[in-house]
Amino acid sequence: ERMKVLKFLQKLTNDNLFVNRKTGVVTIGGKRWDNRSKNLKTGTSLLRDVINNKHTTTIYQNTDDERSAIALEKWGRKEFKHPDGSLPGSDVQIDIDLSPTTNTVRNPKTNRSENGYTPAEITLGHELIHSLRYMEGISTSEKEDYKYTDGTYLVTEKKQSVEELQTIGLGRYRNKYKYTENMLRREHNFQQRLSHISDD
């Protein structure tokens, strides 16, 4: 199980990752040779930031289609002040089904939305971005309307999670954060995700 999680973490980064078989702790070694043809700048940096954070993210694998990250303390969200003398942010638990899934993506040729294949490493990257945001205490529970074009149509999705818009890199958050799912998608030549709402 640990090796399977490690395999997908490894696909995101140019660093060589090791897992301690007793504790399950992941550490970074030197450069990885089998990813050398890819420049995985975003993923490499994301994993370094997650691994080097003072808080801990624990990844649990499942097979029941669950894909989520939860903060173990409420001050993983910016709406809650962390107790005096404590670090901002929270430890995190990720529950992830490592089978591929589908998401609403943009077809670059037609500019229309379609249901697109999403491999497990991209989903894992998405949850790791949530996890880093929780560990830094900048996650948010705000909601806002999100608009995008689908071919010639303007689509409005009401009361969307700002946390998801920021994590995926949608709308006005496209270039606002250091890490987004769509940056990871660009790095791996996958279509850009268009919406948090999926058809599955």
Predicted regions and their residues:
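Active-site or metal-binding loop neighborhoods of secreted/extracellular toxin and effector enzymes
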Residues: 1, 118, 135-200
